[in-house]
From Swiss-Prot:
Name used for this protein in its record: FMRFamide-5
Main location: secreted
Modified sites of kind Phenylalanine amide: F9
Transmembrane regions: none
Family note: Belongs to the FARP (FMRFamide related peptide) family.
Location in or out of the cell: Secreted
GO cellular component assignments: extracellular region
Amino acid sequence: SPTQDFMRF
């Protein structure tokens, strides 16, 4: 999901 994609860091 795009919301969790920012947490891929």
